[in-house]
Amino acid sequence: DLANNFSVYFKKFKKKLSKYMQDAIIKGNKHSGKEYAEAIDFMKRSYESYQEVFEDYHGVLSPSSPGVAPKGLKSTGTAEFNKVWSYLGTPCISLPLLEGENNLPLGVQLIGDKYDDHRFLGVARWLEKECEE
């Protein structure tokens, strides 16, 4: 999906894109239209099974990353734990609610349901306030 959405920018601004983005677009462009359609269908079916969670809960908590935030400002760390939620099209937000080694933040990720951003952000605000106390 990334390749499909960013190929125009790749053609015009390739040198301005990070190596990661360039590689991801090149890799994505190797898939056929049929493979892309199958992936979109799989994503829709995956979301349908995930959506059942929100019949009983307002959000899902998970780690934001495998560890604490990296030192400095060069990187925000890995986005591996966020990819599945982006793939499903669900909102997710990382909140620095915990503290790890060297007083670096350890993020907790809150995941919400599609098209329910107002409630999702309210739950995020509530969670942040509860953890401050």
PLM segments and residue spans:
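Short low-complexity, flexible loop/linker segments enriched in glycine and/or proline
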Residues: D1, G77-T78, V108-I111
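Short helix-loop capping/hinge segments that flank enzyme active sites or metal/cofactor-binding pockets
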Residues: D1-Y47, Q51, P96-G107
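Amphipathic alpha-helical segments in well-structured domains
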Residues: A3, T78-F81, A124
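Structural helix-boundary/capping segments
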Residues: A37-D41, Y87-E133
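Short, surface-exposed loop/helix-turn segments at secondary-structure junctions
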Residues: E38, S65-V84
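Small-aliphatic-rich amphipathic alpha-helix that forms the alpha element of a beta-alpha
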Residues: S49-Q51, T76-P96
